[in-house]
Amino acid sequence: MEKVFYVTTPIYYVNAEPHLGHAYTTVVADFLARWHRLDGYRTFFLTGTDEHGETVYRAAQAAGEDPKAFVDRVSGRFKRAWDLLGIAYDDFIRTTEERHKKVVQLVLKKVYEAGDIYYGEYEGLYCVSCERFYTEKELVEGLCPIHGRPVERRKEGNYFFRMEKYRPWLQEYIQENPDLIRPEGYRNEVLAMLAEPIGDLSISRPKSRVPWGIPLPWDENHVTYVWFDALLNYVSALDYPEGEAYRTFWPHAWHLIGKDILKPHAVFWPTMLKAAGIPMYRHLNVGGFLLGPD
């Protein structure tokens, strides 16, 4: 029986330049890919850049550039950085590519037609840098727990994914598959999140406010929320749903991430997969932050 290994880094956000944290995760993924190739595994190593959303749009405006020109320039710097480090990836996915947009709209349509996406109004505390809403409980002294910056109170009409519907299933799946999320401390952190209602996930932004994104297939006045868009790179790069690469590699997926994006990968992504009828990834491997002397 053929041995198969699929390893991914997060796709890196292009609102800023490559940094040491990006390099650390990518070097670890490169090491794992090389080791598995040497051990006889058919191996696929994916990295890339996340190029839509409000933060990127604002960064392009601040730089005085067209958003597409801005993301082309910064994405190119990630590629050059990996070339300088000798990173031997098999594919570099960009969320502005047509192959990715096609898959995002396909999955959105599938989940929408199944009744798991609805329109509603939301008011909450929003971090522009994270591009996500937080509850009062999640804030640290009233600030974003990741960036330490003030959050904005926002109220707007969005489309929502029925994420709460899949919470009991996800709890059970994680409990029955103790090796899914590693190390164990992060698995326990996710189970603690799931012990309480997680609510539904806002998966769109009004195009009038955030014009830089993938339009919803049923409503051109809204673009796709950046996390619902970005997470699908792991299957769009494999030519989901019909590609030979998808059939071969997806059942063996190892995601490597930093702890700051644990919830999107351990809660958003599994529930999206379940709703779309896509099998779960094999492992989610979580690392901490690189800290300086201060």
What does each model-found stretch correspond to?
Residues E2-I117, E131, M272:
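N-terminal Rossmann-like or analogous alpha/beta NTP/dinucleotide-binding catalytic cores
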Residues E2-T47, R99-V103, E156-D294:
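Structured secondary-structure scaffolds
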Residues V28-L38, A60-K68, G124-C130, G142-P150, ...:
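Short, mixed-charge, low-aromatic patches
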Residues E51, E97, Y126, G288-F289:
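Positions that flank functional sites
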Residues E65-I214:
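Residue patterns forming the tRNA-binding/recognition surfaces of aminoacyl-tRNA synthetases
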